[in-house]
Amino acid sequence: MFLVKMVLGFLIFLSPLCATGLDISQTDIIERSLNFLLFAGILWYFLAKKLRSFLHSKSLEISKRLEEIQAQLKVSKENKKKLLKELEQAKEKAELIISDANKEAYTITQKYELQTKMDVENLIKNSKALMDLEVKKIKRELVESVFKDLRESKKVSFNVQDCVNILKQRL
């Protein structure tokens, strides 16, 4: 097929020469053309299989390399998807940890606020009770000192019933 195309191309190339009125009897163009066509045909006959096998091996090499690159690309894409999935999971886990920490901090804060409030209330109750005791103690001491002063002074005289009433009121 290739040889036929070459012959047709050569004839088309020679057609302008045939159209002119030149005398080509003195030239050896036809012999040279035939020699060239024979040389090209022989060269094609011997080199065609080697050239085809060389080109075929190169195309196989290129396709093999392309397949390797595509496989690497596929692995890279899968790794990327896997890493993105892990990243999303890590973000979700971090958000969960942060929310748990916030909840725990809030719970601890509430616990200490409640404990502090209870401690303050207990301190207030204890201080009120202590103040009441101190007031009673001071009243008792005052009543005792006044009673003692009155008993020691001879100006006032008490009978037993009056002493009992005073002591009852004191307590």
Swiss-Prot record:
InterPro entries: ATP_synth_B-like_membr_sf (IPR028987), ATP_synth_b/b'su_bac/chlpt (IPR002146). It is found in: Cell inner membrane. Keywords: ATP synthesis, Cell inner membrane, Cell membrane, CF(0), Hydrogen ion transport, Ion transport, Membrane, Transmembrane, Transmembrane helix, Transport. F(1)F(0) ATP synthase produces ATP from ADP in the presence of a proton or sodium gradient. F-type ATPases consist of two structural domains, F(1) containing the extramembraneous catalytic core and F(0) containing the membrane proton channel, linked together by a central stalk and a peripheral stalk. During catalysis, ATP synthesis in the catalytic domain of F(1) is coupled via a rotary mechanism of the central stalk subunits to proton translocation. F-type ATPases have 2 components, F(1) - the catalytic core - and F(0) - the membrane proton channel. F(1) has five subunits: alpha(3), beta(3), gamma(1), delta(1), epsilon(1). F(0) has three main subunits: a(1), b(2) and c(10-14). The alpha and beta chains form an alternating ring which encloses part of the gamma chain. F(1) is attached to F(0) by a central stalk formed by the gamma and epsilon chains, while a peripheral stalk is formed by the delta and b chains. HAMAP family: ATP_synth_b_bprime. Belongs to the ATPase B chain family. NCBIfam families: PRK08475.1. This is ATP synthase subunit b. It comes from Helicobacter pylori (strain Shi470). The gene is atpF.
